[in-house]
Amino acid sequence: MKTFVICLILVVAVSAAPDHHDGHLGGHQTGHQGGQQGGHLGGQQGGHLGGHQGGQPGGHLGGHQGGIGGTGGQQHGQHGPGTGAGHQGGYKTHGH
């Protein structure tokens, strides 16, 4: 019974977690604005304006290092505080 309860808690926790694979709004691996590996505006490997983690820690222009060949990053200002943040900050706020 104890094992069942632990499994149930894990399932609920995973279900409640933010979607880091949201496509347009970033996330850890993919997305239009971020992701560690790719994305239009961020990512550690490639991205236009992002930074080390892309859209994950902060929004449209944020990120840790400023991206490779980009102009964003920590110095430019972390525009949005949310996970996989959008243009205005927060989670899932970019719109389209």
Swiss-Prot record:
GO terms for biological process: defense response to bacterium; defense response to fungus; innate immune response; killing of cells of another organism. Residues 1-18 form the signal peptide. Residues 26-89 have a biased composition (Gly residues). It comes from the Eukaryota. Residues 19-96 are annotated as: Disordered. GO terms for cellular component: extracellular region. Sequence repeats lie at residues 23-26, 31-34, 35-38, 39-42, 43-46, 47-50, 51-54, 59-62, 63-66, 67-70, 77-80, 86-89. It is found in: Secreted. Keywords: Antibiotic, Antimicrobial, Fungicide, Immunity, Innate immunity, Repeat, Secreted, Signal. Residues 23-89 are annotated as: 12 X 4 AA repeats of G-X-X-G. Antifungal heat stable protein produced in response to injury. It is active against C.albicans. No antibacterial activity against Gram-positive and Gram-negative bacteria. To H.diomphalia holotricin 3. This is Tenecin-3.
